[in-house]
Amino acid sequence: MPFFAVAFPVFDPVAVAIGPFAIRWYALAYIAGIVIGWLYARMLLQRQRLWGGPSPISLEAFDDFILWVTIGIILGGRTGYVLFYNLDFFIRHPAEIFELWKGGMSFHGGFMGCVAAVVLFGWKRKVPILSLGDITCAVGPIGLFLGRIANFINGELWGRPADASVPWAMVFPNAGPLPRHPSQLYEAGLEGIGLFVILALMIRAGALKRPGLIIGAFLTFYGLARITGEFFREPDPQLGFLWGDMTMGMLLSIPMVIVGILVMITTWRRGRGAPAAATPSSEAAS
């Protein structure tokens, strides 16, 4: 074990307090991620050269979609946590499923909620589902980055014990005396910054002209980033390791990589093809 460890900074769990009303860091991360992602998506939708013509999604339609995807993230994230990470506990205490302020969200569940929101909104509003999925995935790393930073501020989801070769190891307040990897920051870099850069470069190279390509890339590279981060992250105590060093996060991410690769191959072979949908003016009238 290392002879020296970086002191974990002390943060107030409440980010903003106005009288009796308080917003915690994790909630603030969700709010900021949605707002910044919405602004970034609007910027992409207005750049016709990225789409090879007018965007197949109007700004008005995307503004309406934000509420749908927000609900999908929250419901899916909570449902995923209940089913994948702590089902036995919630079977015994079902009322606590609704106590979101106590924490407990799953990315994989939130992603499935996003998929449901994209499909349902696209079907209802006659918006091209693949293009809507592409733009949603393009902004996803923003929320992932902010969420992992909030995990770090809260001193939760810490890493595995580190050895002397890791001078930046930290002793987390609720994780015992051993210095540990700040795995939340690793994941913020991999799932947030790294994934955002990859997708942004692909978009700049014309990926939005091939509907579904960004979806496939997101699935693939997020899955790889999450699997890598899991090697440094302490598994959830109620689950532990499943098989050898396999964790629940790895188990849920492996199918993402496989599906993502298949989607990218299929999309690339299909080529650009026909325009994804009607112009924004015709879509807005639907």
Swiss-Prot record:
Keywords: Cell inner membrane, Cell membrane, Membrane, Transferase, Transmembrane, Transmembrane helix. One of its GO terms (molecular function) is phosphatidylglycerol-prolipoprotein diacylglyceryl transferase activity. Pathway: Protein modification; lipoprotein biosynthesis (diacylglyceryl transfer). It holds the Pfam family LGT. The chain crosses the membrane at residues 25-45, 65-85, 103-123, 127-147, 188-208, 212-232, 248-268. It is an enzyme of class 2 (transferase). A 1,2-diacyl-sn-glycero-3-phospho-(1'-sn-glycerol) binds at R148. It comes from the Bacteria. It is a multi-pass membrane protein. GO terms for cellular component: plasma membrane. Its EC number is 2.5.1.145. It is found in: Cell inner membrane. The keyword Transferase applies. GO terms for biological process: lipoprotein biosynthetic process. Belongs to the Lgt family. Catalyzes the transfer of the diacylglyceryl group from phosphatidylglycerol to the sulfhydryl group of the N-terminal cysteine of a prolipoprotein, the first step in the formation of mature lipoproteins. This is Phosphatidylglycerol--prolipoprotein diacylglyceryl transferase.
